[in-house]
């Protein structure tokens, strides 16, 4: 866990975010929109596009209370709150990311709809049946105990509540390229194959409504040599060290079939 905490550490994240906003021509003293921040705060494969696609599938409504697991800087949470008017609880392990999320919630005026909790996805600080929907993007790859993870998600969902997710899963060959966006080395890389993921989800009380592999679609829509954000542009490099190498390794792993990208929507029985 110490390695994982270091991987997601971002010292002075609030100052770094504010400096990056000003360098990009945005005034933190004025109300920002979630779209202004999209290049910065959707820290998962496919970025804002992937979040919007998952939103179309998730069947979340304005009256719902939603849990965002491994929320990072809460970009998807702000997207949900702004687009639907729903209330979102963010659960994030990294204290640095929690601080950054709270700052950006204030700057977008969405802090009245989004709450940020620091904690573990394996021991969630919420009562049973607390949420109408759960949301998770590129988080399970860091968690070895999938049964406990999915069991906790099921516990905090109301009966019939939906769980929408996007994850990397193991491909046909071992993952060999490190560092990756989610793991500095193999010690924090806990990919499972699709068959195991679906089996554990079913055993945890979920009924599958949608499950699909989006690897090829993602690769076809993402340029292999996509340039990193230029100076003065917002991007993940504000808080992710060595981003170009990590992203390159992730793409190479996907191209060679070492990993696959999947998404799904399930219902809690």
Task: Give residue spans per PLM region.
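Conserved alpha-helix/loop element of class I SAM-dependent methyltransferases that forms part
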Residues: 27, 44-62
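Short, glycine-/aromatic-enriched active-site segment of Class I SAM-dependent methyltransferases
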Residues: 168-188
């Amino acid at each position: 866990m110490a390695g994982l905490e270091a991987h997601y550490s971002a010292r002075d994240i609030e100052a770094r975010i504010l400096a990056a906003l000003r360098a990009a021509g945005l005034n933190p003293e004025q109300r920002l929109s979630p779209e202004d921040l999209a290049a910065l705060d959707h820290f998962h494969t496919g970025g804002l596009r992937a979040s919007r696609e998952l939103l179309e599938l998730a069947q979340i409504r304005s009256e719902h209370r939603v849990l965002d697991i491994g929320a990072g800087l809460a970009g998807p949470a702000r997207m949900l709150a702004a687009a639907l008017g729903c209330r979102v609880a963010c659960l994030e392990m990294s204290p640095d990311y929690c601080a950054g999320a709270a700052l950006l919630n204030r700057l977008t005026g969405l802090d009245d709809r989004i709450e940020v909790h620091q904690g573990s996805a394996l021991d969630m600080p919420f009562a049973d049946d607390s949420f109408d929907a759960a949301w998770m993007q590129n988080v399970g790859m860091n968690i070895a105990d999938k049964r406990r993870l999915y069991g906790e998600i099921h516990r905090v969902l109301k009966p019939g509540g939906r769980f929408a997710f996007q994850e990397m899963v193991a491909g046909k060959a071992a993952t060999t390229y490190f560092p990756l966006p989610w793991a500095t080395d193999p010690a924090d890389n806990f990919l499972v194959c699709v068959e195991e993921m679906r089996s554990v989800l079913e055993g945890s009380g979920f009924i599958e409504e949608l499950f699909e592999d989006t690897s090829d679609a993602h690769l076809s829509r993402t340029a292999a040599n996509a340039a990193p954000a230029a100076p003065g542009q917002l991007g993940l490099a504000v808080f992710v060290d060595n981003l170009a190498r990590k992203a390159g390794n992730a793409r190479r792993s996907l191209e060679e079939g070492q990993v696959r990208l999947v998404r799904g929507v399930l219902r809690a029985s």
